[in-house]
A protein has these predicted regions:
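Structural microenvironment flanking redox-active thiols in thiol-disulfide oxidoreductases
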Residues: 80-120, 134-140
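Short active-site neighborhood of thiol/selenol oxidoreductases, capturing the structured segment around
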Residues: 57-86, 102-104
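Conserved beta-strand segments of alpha/beta enzyme cores
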Residues: 102, 125-127
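Hydrophobic beta-strand positions
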Residues: 48-49, 71, 152
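Short loop/turn microsegments at loop-to-beta-strand junctions
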Residues: 44-45, 67, 147-148
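Oxidative protein folding and maturation machinery
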Residues: 1-57
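Thiol/disulfide oxidoreductase modules built on the thioredoxin-like
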Residues: 134-176
Length: 178
């Protein structure tokens, strides 16, 4: 379930209910922790990303009015569909939007060979990166139970949209008249 507004009260009930078994209560408490991270309106968790060259940078150092985080796995069918939609999006690919929004495609998993094999699928204007230290997954900085995951951040790295669809991001950017 990807609608946190609906899921959060369910988790709160399960974690407090004496009718819930220990495994379900533990799962609900863990999910509550994930729901609480990177909420809309909060500052997004910073992380280090590694470029194909091996150079490492911090997400918070991206200096554009908007940052679009794409957490993905190149072998994931849903990720491939989202990537294709983004690459053909008239909104995301308009020259004016491209000046305002930096897209960070971030592979958080450990199989670097998979990421390397698919590098050419990421457009040149995007930041193509991976998590060399696997920090995002091991520290659970982001809720990545399901991928792809898209986050739209403002210039201060405040979360504007969390786990959004491409259409929601397009609509947001269009409504901001970028």
């Amino acid at each position: 379930l990807r609608n946190e507004e609906l899921y959060e009260p369910v988790c709160r009930f399960q974690s407090a209910s004496s009718l819930t078994d220990e495994a379900a209560r533990s799962r609900a408490q863990h999910d509550l922790k994930l729901i609480g991270m990177n909420k809309v309106g909060s500052i997004a968790a910073d992380f280090i990303y590694t470029l194909p060259s091996g150079m490492q940078k911090r997400m918070r150092d991206i200096c554009t009015p908007y940052t679009l985080l794409l957490f993905y796995n190149p072998d994931c069918h849903g990720c491939a569909e989202t990537l294709a939609t983004m690459k053909t999006s008239a909104v995301l690919n308009s020259p004016h939007i491209m000046k305002q929004v930096k897209i960070l495609a971030f592979y958080p998993d450990e199989d670097r060979e998979v990421w390397t094999k698919h590098q050419n699928e990421i457009p040149d204007g995007w930041i193509n990166s991976y998590d060399k230290e696997l920090t995002v997954l091991t520290e659970e900085c982001y809720d990545l139970k399901a991928m792809p995951a898209l986050y739209l951040l403002d210039k201060d790295k405040k979360v504007l949209l969390k786990d959004a669809t491409v259409k929601e991001i397009e609509d947001y950017l269009k409504n901001k008249s970028l």
